């Protein structure tokens, strides 16, 4: 049975942990800047027209590439989470303590918010698009969609990055993670927006001042990420081991 470790103040404020928080902040900022920036660019080029298939592909590819790079640049320092749902999933599997994970969340949310503030400034005040479910769908349907696609993301993180038996598969973890996010945006984008990431949705909501549907992008991803962490960590990895360093799961 996997054990969840709460952690200690000393560990969470060690030099290594502080460096990890900075790495999460920077990597999340760069990911969200590119991801949300691609959506803003689409709206500008199309005069805020409805998202068409070409635009969906462009936004999905931008997120996939940006996440691939973001995970890669943070992997050796923080593990390259960039996502509270990933952090929760890894905490459920015993790969990071709850306390340290909480500070990861803060760094990720701050990174996303700063990215969106920068986008608002450099685009001369263009609207920062927020996530929301499509017309005709309800919040529960959006939550279920986000549970499924976030489960797929965190399951991929476990299989390619966190599993002790991953071997050489770990070298493709960042690109596999980017691929699953891009694919999920193609599948879910027209319905729930395809967030999979509370931080990705939080920053735009803060800058736009619109939290009307933001709960969907906390509930769905956290449930999906937690389930993936429990199933892969408990069923497939199967036993608790001492908390690894970031290099062991990134």
Swiss-Prot record:
Q: Which UniProt keywords apply?
A: Membrane, Repeat, Transmembrane, Transmembrane helix, Transport, Vacuole
Supply the Pfam families for this chain. MIP
Q: What is this protein called?
A: Probable aquaporin TIP-type RB7-18C
Q: Which GO terms describe its biological process?
A: water transport
Is Lipid biosynthesis there in the keyword field? no
What is this entry's stated membrane topology?
Multi-pass membrane protein
Q: Could you state one GO cellular component term attached to this entry?
A: plant-type vacuole membrane
This molecule's function is given as: Channel protein in tonoplast. These proteins may allow the diffusion of amino acids and/or peptides from the vacuolar compartment to the cytoplasm.
Q: What is the lineage of its organism?
A: Eukaryota, Viridiplantae, Streptophyta, Embryophyta, Tracheophyta
Intracellular or extracellular location(s): Vacuole membrane
Q: Which organism is it from?
A: Nicotiana tabacum
């Amino acid at each position: 049975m996997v054990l969840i470790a709460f952690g200690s103040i000393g560990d969470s404020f060690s030099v290594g942990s502080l460096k990890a928080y900075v790495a999460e902040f920077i990597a999340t900022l760069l990911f969200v800047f590119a991801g949300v920036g691609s959506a803003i660019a689409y709206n500008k080029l199309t005069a805020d027209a409805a998202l068409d298939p070409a635009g969906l592909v462009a936004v999905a590819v931008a997120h996939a590439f940006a996440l691939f790079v973001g995970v890669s640049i943070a992997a050796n320092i923080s593990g390259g989470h960039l996502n509270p749902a990933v952090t929760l999933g890894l905490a459920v599997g015993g790969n990071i303590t709850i306390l340290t994970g909480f500070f990861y969340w803060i760094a990720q949310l701050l990174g996303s918010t700063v990215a969106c503030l920068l986008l608002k400034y450099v685009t001369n005040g263009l609207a920062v698009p927020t996530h929301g479910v499509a017309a005709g769908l309800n919040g529960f349907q959006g939550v279920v969609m986000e549970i499924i696609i976030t489960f797929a993301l965190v399951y991929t993180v476990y299989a390619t990055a966190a599993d002790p038996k991953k071997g050489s598969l770990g070298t493709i973890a960042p690109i596999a993670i980017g691929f699953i996010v891009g694919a999920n945006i193609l599948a879910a984008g027209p319905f729930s927006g395809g967030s999979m990431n509370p931080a990705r949705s939080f920053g735009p909501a803060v800058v736009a001042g619109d939290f009307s549907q933001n709960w969907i992008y906390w509930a769905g991803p956290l449930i999906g990420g937690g389930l993936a962490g429990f199933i892969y960590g408990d069923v497939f990895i199967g036993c608790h081991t001492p908390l690894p360093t970031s290099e062991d799961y990134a």
